[in-house]
Amino acid sequence: MTINALLLSSSRVGDTPYLAHAIPFIKPLTTNAQKWIFIPYAGVSMSYDNYLASVVTGLSELELDISGIHQHPDPQQAIKDADGILIGGGNTFHLLHQLYRYDLVTLIGEQVALGKPYIGWSAGSNVSGQSIRTTNDMPIIEPPSFKALNLLPFQLNPHYSNYQAPGHNGETRAQRLLEFTKVDPLTPVVGIVEGSALWRQGDKLSLLGDQPAYLFCGEQQEIPIPVGSDLSHLLKA
């Protein structure tokens, strides 16, 4: 089997309904996978039940059987029994902390490597990379390690935008990612803009959506990646 993983930048684009823009991206992964497990651990300011309800409503037209991992007495068995895995956005540090707490990091990687579809957005995309070192989130809790699922052998930065409000003197996103590349010049970072996604199908990696992505690696800074690009070469990073 081969990896089938969809990494969405965000759950919304502008004022669109929750996950509405992502339906065309998600649908191809659900053809033979109807029983999905949703992992809400990134949700800190909402209850897991409410988070699950939002996802079920947002994906209702796909007619999937979605349950929350928090509803199962054995989280590891729930992962094994599901046809596919969904991980939502929120705080990436809390998400990874809980994945380690329930000993799910290695298991999810193994299950996805066997062909189980994986769909993540925002924090759920952050944890698909080598590590969470390029998340935008505040480190509200300390996971045992920053090492993540490694479904992609590089770093991701969802919600990518280099906008700087007039009069604001903090660093831009590009400046923050430059800092990363100074410390680790050999590891690529792909910034994915809201409304776009990366789709890994085995040895193929594609940029989906109508927005460019941006590459940061060593001396290469904020290099535009055109819409529809084949990024398979990054799987050899």
UniProtKB/Swiss-Prot annotation:
Hydrolyzes dipeptides containing N-terminal aspartate residues. May play a role in allowing the cell to use peptide aspartate to spare carbon otherwise required for the synthesis of the aspartate family of amino acids. It comes from the Bacteria. Disulfide bonds: none annotated. Keywords: Cytoplasm, Dipeptidase, Hydrolase, Protease, Serine protease. This is Peptidase E. SUPFAM superfamilies: Class I glutamine amidotransferase-like. The gene is pepE. It holds the Pfam family Peptidase_S51. It comes from Shewanella baltica (strain OS185).
